[in-house]
Structure formats: structure tokens, C-alpha cells
Swiss-Prot record:
Gene from which the chain derives: Camk2d
Mode of membrane association: Peripheral membrane protein
Positions bearing N-acetylalanine: 2
Name this protein carries in UniProt: Calcium/calmodulin-dependent protein kinase type II subunit delta
Lineage of the organism: Eukaryota, Metazoa, Chordata, Craniata, Vertebrata
Phosphothreonine modification, residue list: 287, 306-307, 365, 370-371
Length: 533
């Protein structure tokens, strides 16, 4: 029998040196190409620990990095697969993080910030021209080529980058770093290249004053700020920033992605292309001082989060009851709040709010300068939560057509109204869409409380949650119904379909009775129809 030849090209051609960094499945080490003596950084991935989906991500990252050749992007020189390991050979960048370099400078002005963001925009523009969205622009991924004065800024880490066609907008999953996420990602809307420009706006804001535009200890409140575009230019630090700089930030931090400035447009902005005459040359000592604190906070909280991830007990029951020793956790996930306090909604518009904490713990955003998406797992879980929201919205809207698109024709269900019987198919549910749901004329607000998603391979998932439904009864009094639900999802032809659900507790949405004596509504003790889907 012929023996299989194992590739040893990396081992033969490269010599490894000290460790430069470490990830969950990878380590970065300095290396030298033996024939030339040229030094590089080798990202070494332990492929024995990777799932099939992780392998796809690795291939995508290598494919994207091979495509991008630009002086402001860390370049991939080689991609080699050996038994048990994959090697990505990158530029060796020795200048450290851009933000750390800025605080070590004796002089730093608005014009310097303009030069920094210009290089970042050049890298982003190159990505976008090649159909690549980075999705994780943040200070940790902005490096300097060397320690020399005036060294080029280099964009790094394309682990979350995606490939898009032209100006394609789609839901690519919930990925990024909390303070840099765009409103459309937080709304779980289709998104594309504009998400990178939003992150550039956040970075530029920090470059000018040393602190971020959106900030809150509580992640939910932080996300509300971002979705509302709630930032300002407070005195006195912003009084010395030119109007042109503020104008560029406003154009980058535009809530509507269709109206947000593009990378190529930003490069033509006067504050960028006419820097010498437009940007201020005044030294910004307060910015440097604030940036030092910002950097220290990033590093400290990053270290705490790393420790937590390494030592966390992932038992959901324990984590709901006990905080890890020595770590303060802002655990407000079980508090039900209404989005009406911050975002006005039409009176009769059915709403679905997700208040969740998939792992049972919720760290404060101060510790969350780490990229969301445990390599893609969280994005996939968010996909399941999103499609569950869509299904419940279809129910609230009485939209049977939308409901059937999300559900498998052979949907099976256990629910109180079926009296202990297993219901199969759509006819049982059709009755309620055609006869009960059209009679709803009151506001309905559905809350998915604390959903837990279990992924079963690449194409199946199970979600369990508490479903709260708020409504106004016939007397104008607010009421709330609760049920516990579990739904099983299966992906067919790239689309998720609900194949089974199990609901306990009370039915969810009260419906006006078809016939009420004396024309009086009676939700408190009279007969009522109930939604059963």
C-alpha cells in the first residue's frame, strides 16, 4: 500500500523563535525563512482542535489575506498546512499598537490624528474595493510597521472578515467588539461595508480626545446609545477641535448605513486631503493623558476577561447564582425592561424584545474590549435568536405567509391547547391565524427572556426561553402572560426552519371573544380565545 506523503514545508523552510501572542487555538511566534534570513510572524493553528466550521473560517481568513496587498495592511506571505497544524506567515510588525505609540510621543496634534485615520481609511478602502469587510476595526488591530518615527499604520487580524459582492447587505452574524459595533448590527439588520466606516468614526473620536463616543458599564445601555447615535462633543476638550474634524465624525457616525460616508469619500474630505491647511497643529496634551487611561483600562480589563474565560465554570445553573471570586459582574440580564423608555414605537406595532444572557453571566462592557463571537459560535447563536424573533413577529402580526416560510410544513408541537397531543402540520395553527389573530386590536409586546441556544452540528439548533407577552385588556389595564418555550431549528438550503416546538404554561396572546353579551369585553373572567402557535 502506498504511503501518504506528509507536507513538511514549513518545518523545512522556517525556523521558529519566541512567542509573540496567543489565542484559543493558535499561537503567534517570530520565525525566519532559512534560505533568505527574512523574519516573519507565524500564526500557528492547532488544526486537531478545530471543527469543520473552524476549518472553513481558517480557509476564509487565508483566502482573504492572500487577496489583500497594501502598505497599510499586515501582509500574508505564505499559508502552509502540515499534519495537525496550519501556518500563516505574516509580516513581522515590530512597532506595537498605534494607540500605545501615540501616548509615548512628545507632540501629538489634530493633524497627526488626521494622518493616522487616513492610513486606516486607505486600508479599509483597499478591503472594500476587493469585496472584504473587516468587521473588527479597533485599537488592538491597528499596529505600526516598526518603532521608527513615521512608521506606517498596519491593519491586522482578519479572523472575522467576510467576503461580500459589491454593495451587498446581508445578515452575516453578530460579530465585532461592543463599543465599535454599528447600529445595524445591533438591530440585527442586513449589513455590509458601512459597518467598518462606523468603527472608523469611533476610532477617530478616540484619536481626538482619548475616550470613546459611546460608553456605559451596562452593555444593554451601551447598545441603546449606539442604536440611537447618542454621542456629543462636550466642552472643553472638543472646543479646540476644528469643525471639519467634527463634520467627518458625524458623517462616519451616521445611523443610516445608506447615508454613511464611504472610505473613498472620507479620503476626499478636506480634513484628510487638505490636512496642512485645515487640521489644527496645536499639541493635544489632554488627549494624550486621556488616551493613557483608555489604554490602561483596555489592557487591564482585557487581562481580567482572559482570566475569567480561562477559569469560568460554564454550568448555567451555577453561573446564574454565583459570581466568580474577585470579579465584579454586572448581571442585570434577568431584569425586564421596556424599550419604550428610549425608543418610541407606534401604538399598535407588535414588538419583540430579547433580554438575554446566553452563558448565564453578563460582564460589564468595560471588560469587553475583546471581540465578540467565540470564533463564530456566538454569531450562530444570534442567528437562531434572530430567526426566533422573526417567527414571533409573524405571529404577532398575524402573518401566516411569513410564518409558513419560517416553519417546516411538517412542524410538530406540544402545547396546552392540544390537550397533551402531538400536533403535526400547519392546519392546527392556520385556524388561529385566520380566526383569532385578525381580531387583535390592542398593542402587543412580546419579550424573549434569557434565551439559551444549543448548537447541534452546523445545521441544527435548539433554543429555550421564557416568552412574556404584554397587552392591554378590555378595561385598558396592562396585563402580562408567560409561557416557557423550546424550539428546534434545522437549516435547509441555507434557511433556518422551525421543525418542532414545545410550550408549557399559559397560552400567550389573549384574543377578543367573537361574541360578548351586551357588547362588553371581559378579559378577567369571561370566555376568551387564545393564540396557540
Amino acid at each position: 500500500m502506498a504511503s501518504t506523503t506528509t507536507c513538511t514545508r514549513f518545518t523545512d523552510e522556517y525556523q521558529l523563535f519566541e512567542e509573540l501572542g496567543k489565542g484559543a487555538f493558535s499561537v503567534v511566534r517570530r520565525c525566519m525563512k532559512i534560505p533568505t534570513g527574512q523574519e516573519y510572524a507565524a500564526k500557528i493553528i492547532n488544526t486537531k482542535k478545530l471543527s469543520a466550521r473552524d476549518h472553513q473560517k481558517l480557509e476564509r481568513e487565508a483566502r482573504i489575506c492572500r487577496l489583500l496587498k497594501h502598505p497599510n495592511i499586515v501582509r500574508l506571505h505564505d499559508s502552509i498546512s502540515e499534519e495537525g497544524f496550519h501556518y500563516l506567515v505574516f509580516d513581522l510588525v515590530t512597532g506595537g499598537e498605534l494607540f500605545e505609540d501615540i501616548v509615548a510621543r512628545e507632540y501629538y496634534s489634530e493633524a497627526d490624528a488626521s494622518h493616522c485615520i487616513q492610513q486606516i481609511l486607505e486600508s479599509v478602502n483597499h478591503c472594500h474595493l476587493n469585496g472584504i469587510v473587516h468587521r473588527d476595526l479597533k485599537p488592538e488591530n491597528l499596529l505600526l510597521a516598526s518603532k521608527s518615527k513615521g512608521a506606517a499604520v498596519k491593519l491586522a487580524d482578519f479572523g472575522l472578515a467576510i467576503e461580500v459582492q459589491g454593495d451587498q447587505q446581508a445578515w452575516f452574524g453578530f460579530a465585532g467588539t461592543p463599543g465599535y459595533l454599528s447600529p445595524e448590527v445591533l438591530r440585527k439588520d442586513p449589513y455590509g461595508k458601512p459597518v467598518d466606516m462606523w468603527a472608523c468614526g469611533v476610532i477617530l473620536y478616540i484619536l481626538l480626545v482619548g475616550y470613546p463616543p459611546f460608553w456605559d458599564e451596562d452593555q444593554h445601555r451601551l447598545y441603546q446609545q449606539i442604536k440611537a447615535g447618542a454621542y456629543d462633543f462636550p466642552s472643553p476638550e472638543w472646543d479646540t477641535v476644528t469643525p471639519e474634524a467634527k463634520d467627518l465624525i458625524n458623517k462616519m457616525l451616521t445611523i443610516n448605513p445608506a447615508k454613511r460616508i464611504t472610505a473613498s469619500e472620507a479620503l476626499k474630505h478636506p480634513w484628510i486631503c487638505q490636512r496642512s491647511t485645515v487640521a489644527s497643529m496645536m499639541h493635544r496634551q489632554e488627549t494624550v493623558d486621556c488616551l493613557k487611561k483608555f489604554n490602561a483600562r483596555r489592557k487591564l480589563k482585557g487581562a481580567i476577561l482572559t482570566t475569567m474565560l480561562a477559569t469560568r465554570n460554564f454550568s448555567a445553573a451555577k453561573s446564574l447564582l454565583k459570581k466568580p471570586d474577585g470579579v465584579k459582574i454586572n448581571n442585570k440580564a434577568n431584569v425586564v425592561t421596556s424599550p419604550k423608555e428610549n425608543i418610541p414605537t407606534p401604538a399598535l406595532e407588535p414588538q419583540t424584545t430579547v433580554i438575554h444572557n446566553p452563558d448565564g453571566n453578563k460582564e460589564s462592557t468595560e471588560s469587553s474590549n475583546t471581540t465578540i463571537e467565540d470564533e463564530d459560535v456566538k454569531a450562530r447563536k444570534q442567528e437562531i435568536i434572530k430567526v426566533t424573533e422573526q417567527l414571533i413577529e409573524a405571529i404577532n402580526n398575524g402573518d401566516f405567509e411569513a410564518y409558513t416560510k419560517i416553519c417546516d410544513p411538517g412542524l410538530t408541537a406540544f402545547e396546552p391547547e392540544a390537550l397533551g397531543n402531538l400536533v403535526e402540520g400547519m392546519d392546527f395553527h392556520r385556524f388561529y391565524f385566520e380566526n383569532a389573530l385578525p381580531k387583535i386590536n390592542k398593542p402587543i409586546h412580546t419579550i424573549i427572556l434569557n434565551p439559551h441556544v444549543h448548537l447541534v452540528g452546523d445545521d441544527a439548533a435548539c433554543i429555550a426561553y421564557i416568552r412574556l407577552t404584554q397587552y392591554m385588556d378590555g378595561n385598558g389595564m396592562p396585563k402580562t402572560m408567560q409561557s416557557e418555550e423550546t424550539r428546534v431549528w434545522h437549516r435547509r438550503d441555507g434557511k433556518w426552519q422551525n421543525i418542532h416546538f414545545h410550550r408549557s404554561g399559559s397560552p400567550t396572546v389573549p384574543i377578543k371573544p367573537p361574541c360578548i353579551p351586551n357588547g362588553k369585553e371581559n378579559f378577567s373572567g369571561g370566555t376568551s380565545l387564545w393564540q396557540n402557535i
